[in-house]
Amino acid sequence: MDDKFTTLPCELEDYPGSITCPHCSAQITTAVDHVVGKMSWVVCTAITLACLPCCCIPFLCNSTKDVRHTCPKCKQAVFVYKIL
């Protein structure tokens, strides 16, 4: 596994950021994609205990998902901001 994820600035959170892509060396603004992560499952479990029909809500809300930053030029993942 490439260790390039750890060398990126920590300013990348849930919004696009300007960086130099560690894969293609282009100066880019990252593309963001919200993906299901641990926080989505934790909130789903908590909601299931209270109201079973509402358990899918965390999978529809971006605020509970991890954020994957990708390079729009080479399409490689450059950073994943994990909520939990």
Curated annotation (Swiss-Prot):
Keywords: Host membrane, Membrane, Metal-binding, Zinc
Topological category with respect to the lipid bilayer: Peripheral membrane protein
Subcellular location: Host membrane
Residue stretches making up the LITAF domain: 1-83
Start and end residues of each stretch annotated as Membrane-binding amphipathic helix: 39-61
Predominant location category: host cell
InterPro entries: LITAF, LITAF_fam
Record-listed Zn(2+) binding positions: C21, C24, C71, C74
PANTHER family, alphabetized: LIPOPOLYSACCHARIDE-INDUCED TUMOR NECROSIS FACTOR-ALPHA FACTOR (PTHR23292), LIPOPOLYSACCHARIDE-INDUCED TUMOR NECROSIS FACTOR-ALPHA FACTOR HOMOLOG (PTHR23292:SF46)
Protein name per its UniProtKB record: Uncharacterized protein 075L
Phylogenetic lineage: Viruses, Varidnaviria, Bamfordvirae, Nucleocytoviricota, Megaviricetes
